[in-house]
Regions:
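Structural signature of tandem alpha-helical TPR/SEL1-like repeats
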Residues: 136-142, 170-186, 207-216
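Catalytic-center loop of serine/cysteine hydrolases
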Residues: 1-139
Length: 216
């Protein structure tokens, strides 16, 4: 269930359960596991039960070094094992995501362009966009355009490009030759179920003065 929940995180490629089954009930070196599976990160966990109480220990590890990125323990009532399992899965996936994102962004910031994939360029674009400084919007735009060069099917790249142009248009920092609304609409067509694309589209509408569309 946790594998399923983590696979819903847009920027993650998660190793299938059958690939990890060989390590069940074993204590292999995390670095070897990561190398065998081609994984950048490894999630490790254990369950202990005492009476009606159950404790889940989870840790997120960096594959190459085995370094801890995040760890937490969860306690619950074991009377309804399915309910507590669902609670654990939801909590772990929700709390792990920002730590994974921060780690991935920091990794992407250390890469040269030649080493980057489209997702790395998107991490760089979002990092600059989220700083909300005038100069950073231009840099975010450049990274979004680079992501589009690498993979024009990335809806989020078009959304970031659109919102950066919309902000720059509002700030009158640069002549805008492309329509931010059209770029945002292209993003939604490519990634209709991406909440971040829809959120950025709302910002584009807001900058265009269409508050009704922004709120929808």
């Amino acid at each position: 269930d946790l594998i399923t929940a983590l696979s819903r995180i847009k920027f993650l490629d998660v190793i299938a359960r059958n690939s990890t089954a060989v390590y069940k009930n074993k204590t292999p070196d995390i670095r070897q596991v990561a190398s065998d599976l081609g994984a950048r990160y490894v999630v490790e966990g254990s369950v202990r039960k005492a009476g009606n109480k159950i404790r889940l220990n989870v840790q997120l590890l960096e594959g190459n070094s085995g370094a801890h990125i995040w760890a937490k323990k969860y306690d619950g009532d074991a009377e309804d094992i399915f309910e507590i399992q669902d609670q654990f899965v939801d909590q772990v996936a929700k709390e792990m995501q920002p730590h994974l994102l921060e780690t991935e962004v920091n990794r992407a910031r250390r890469l040269s362009k030649a080493e980057m994939g489209p997702q790395d360029a998107l991490f760089r674009a979002m990092w600059h966009y989220n700083r909300h400084q005038d100069a950073d919007f231009l840099v975010a735009l450049e990274w979004a355009e680079f992501a589009i060069e690498l993979d024009p099917e990335k809806g989020l790249a078009w959304a970031i490009k659109g919102v950066c142009l919309a902000v720059m248009q509002t700030l009158q920092k640069q002549e805008i030759k492309e329509n931010p609304l059209e770029l945002g609409q292209k993003a939604i067509l490519l990634s209709p179920n991406d909440p971040l694309c829809r959120s950025l589209m709302g910002h584009i509408y807001n900058n265009a003065g269409n508050k009704a569309a922004a709120e929808s």
